[in-house]
Curated annotation (Swiss-Prot):
Organism: Mycosarcoma maydis
Chief site of localization: nucleus
Similarity comment: family membership: Belongs to the ENY2 family.
Upper taxonomic lineage: Eukaryota, Fungi, Dikarya, Basidiomycota, Ustilaginomycotina
Protein name per UniProt: Transcription and mRNA export factor SUS1
UniProt function note: Involved in mRNA export coupled transcription activation by association with both the TREX-2 and the SAGA complexes. At the promoters, SAGA is required for recruitment of the basal transcription machinery. It influences RNA polymerase II transcriptional activity through different activities such as TBP interaction and promoter selectivity, interaction with transcription activators, and chromatin modification through histone acetylation and deubiquitination.
Length: 106
């Protein structure tokens, strides 16, 4: 996933248009970049980033032949499961506030 992109899995169910509009507004307003910086800082401060890098390195070394798609399949659920609850809650709060402010403008 490139910087500035949202996973399309969240848009499943026909909400692609709304999803894309939200993503566009997040990027255009600069909120996407602010949230990305906040996420990186919080993950670094919590030690999650270091732990995840160590886990990823171990998993990569365990593969007989290094396969990036296979590694992503293993790492993605681990990343989602180990994301600190306070980080998830804080970012969801920031997104909710952004939506509240921007839905009034729509």
């Amino acid at each position: 996933m490139e910087e500035g992109e949202l996973s399309t899995g969240a848009a499943a169910g026909g909400g692609d248009e709304l999803y894309n509009a939200l993503h566009q507004r997040l990027v255009a307003s600069g909120e996407w970049q602010r949230l990305l910086i906040l996420l990186r800082r919080m993950l670094d401060e919590s030690g999650w980033e270091s732990e995840f890098q160590a886990y990823a390195t171990t998993k990569a070394k365990q593969q007989p032949v290094l396969s990036v798609p296979d590694l992503i399949d293993v790492l993605t659920p681990h990343a989602q499961d180990t994301l600190p609850a306070h980080v998830r809650a804080h970012l969801l709060d920031k997104l909710t506030n952004f939506l509240d402010r921007n839905l009034e403008d729509a």
